Swiss-Prot record:
The keyword Aminoacyl-tRNA synthetase does not apply. This is D-ribose pyranase. Pathway: Carbohydrate metabolism; D-ribose degradation; D-ribose 5-phosphate from beta-D-ribopyranose: step 1/2. Belongs to the RbsD / FucU family. RbsD subfamily. One of its GO terms (biological process) is D-ribose catabolic process.
Length: 134
């Protein structure tokens, strides 16, 4: 059995395919993610699993250099923004973009996976940009 934190085979596979600058997204239950082979739907019910638990687990196995968040999270969900910042290392760039731009980035060929959680708080979506480990 796998010893590392991520047990979901689809998430583990997506992380293992990442190269420098590739993207992986973690989304709330309401984000309109494409229904394609990159969709990893974890949502069981409202708030299960929650966004922050999935993010924390993914970060144990993924080296990141930048994150993208919706500009709207600053006012609509400041508590979630604070929780995200606690998990992100100081050397990781945080870029705020319009929520509409985030929706378009989900379709990027650089995006290797769209993880849907059961999160039901507004703008609980993040795009993780991969870094190298050397």
């Amino acid at each position: 059995m796998k010893k590392t934190a991520v047990l979901n085979s689809h998430i583990s596979s997506a992380i293992s395919t990442l190269g420098h600058y590739d993207l992986l997204t973690i989304n709330d239950a309401g984000m309109p993610i494409p229904n394609d082979d990159k969709r990893i739907d974890l949502a069981v019910t409202k708030s299960l699993p929650c966004f922050i638990d999935v993010l924390e687990t993914v970060l144990t196995e993924m080296e990141i250099q930048k994150i993208y968040l919706a500009e709207e999270i600053k006012t609509a969900n400041a508590q979630q923004l604070k929780a995200i910042k606690k998990l992100i290392n100081d050397d990781v760039e945080i870029k705020f973009i319009a929520h509409s731009e985030m929706k378009e980035m989900l379709k990027s060929p650089l995006n290797k996976g769209n993880i849907r959680t059961g999160e039901i708080t507004p703008f609980s979506n993040i795009i993780l940009e991969s870094n190298v480990t050397f």
